Amino acid sequence: MNEEITLLAAAADPAATENIGWVQTIVLSIVQGLTEFLPISSSGHLRIISELFWGADAGASFTAVVQLGTEAAVLVFFAKEIWQIITGWFAGVFNKERRGFEYRMGWMIIVATIPVVILGVLGKDLIREALRNMWITASVLILFSLVFILAEKMGKKERDYDKLTMKDAIIMGLAQCLALIPGVSRSGGTISAGLFLGLKREVATKFSFLLAIPAVLGSGLYSLPDAFAPSSGQAASGLQLTVGTLVAFVVGYISIAWLMKFVANHSFSWFAAYRIPAGLLVMLLLALGMLNP
C-alpha cells in the first residue's frame, strides 16, 4: 500500500521543472494505485519507475496529490465504518453516555496522526531532498523486509478490531512516521507494528488504512496550491494531476478489495519475498549507472 506518505512536506518540490507526458502520468498513477496499499513502498516504486523509464523523478508533490485518489478509494471502501466513527465521535463529544467504541476509535485516529504531522512539517526539507535517494530506497526495501518476517513470526495475531486500544493506536501512529523514508511503506510500517502488538492481519490492515486517511488527505490538500500553480515548477499539469488522481482511485479501490481478502489467509512474508529481490535489482541498476541516485 504510502504505502509511504509524502506528507505535508511535499508541498513545494523544486526538483520538478519539466512537464511529464501523458503516458508517464497514467503509468505512475496506476503504480500509485497498485502499490499505495501493498507494503512494498508506493513512493519508492514511483521514484524507481519514473527514473528508470523517463530519466527523472516526477516529484514528491505529484505523489502527494495523486495519493488523494487512493485515499478517496479508502473513503469509499470503508464508508460505513468511517461514517460510524464520525457520528460516534461527535455523539460522544456532546453526550458522555454515548461514548462507545466508535468514539474511542475517533480519538485513536486523531492522536495517532499527531506524530506524523509534526515530523512531516519539521522534516520537510529532509523529506524533499536527502531521503529521496535511490540508494536509501533500495536499502530500506531490503532491510524492512526483515521487519515483516519478524512481525509474522513474533506476532500472536489473535486480537480483533474491537480490542484496539489507545496504546495500539499511538504505537502504530509512531510506526507511520517511518513512511517518511521512501522504501519503508506506510502500510508496511503500521501493519508490522499491529502484528507485533498481536492484532490479526486483517485488523492491523484495516486500522492501517483508516489511520492513513487524515495524514495522506492533509498531505495532498496541502500540496494542491503549489501543484496546480503555473509558477510552481510541478512536473504535471492540472489536467494530468486530475486524471492521474482518478486513475489512482479506480486502481486503488481494486487493490484494497484484493488485499483485504489476501491478508485473511496469507502471510505478509510474501511481500518480503518481493521486496528483497526488488531492492537488490535497484542496487544493481544504480551500480551500472542505469538509475540516477
Swiss-Prot record:
The keyword Membrane applies. Catalyzes the dephosphorylation of undecaprenyl diphosphate (UPP). Confers resistance to bacitracin. Signal peptide: none annotated. Bacitracin is thought to be involved in the inhibition of peptidoglycan synthesis by sequestering undecaprenyl diphosphate, thereby reducing the pool of lipid carrier available. Pfam families: BacA. It is an enzyme of class 3 (hydrolase). This is Undecaprenyl-diphosphatase. GO terms for molecular function: undecaprenyl-diphosphatase activity. InterPro entries: UppP (IPR003824). It comes from the Bacteria. One of its GO terms (biological process) is regulation of cell shape. It is a multi-pass membrane protein. It catalyses: di-trans,octa-cis-undecaprenyl diphosphate + H2O = di-trans,octa-cis-undecaprenyl phosphate + phosphate + H(+). The keyword Transmembrane applies. The chain crosses the membrane at residues 74-94, 107-127, 134-154, 209-229, 243-263, 271-291. One of its GO terms (cellular component) is plasma membrane.
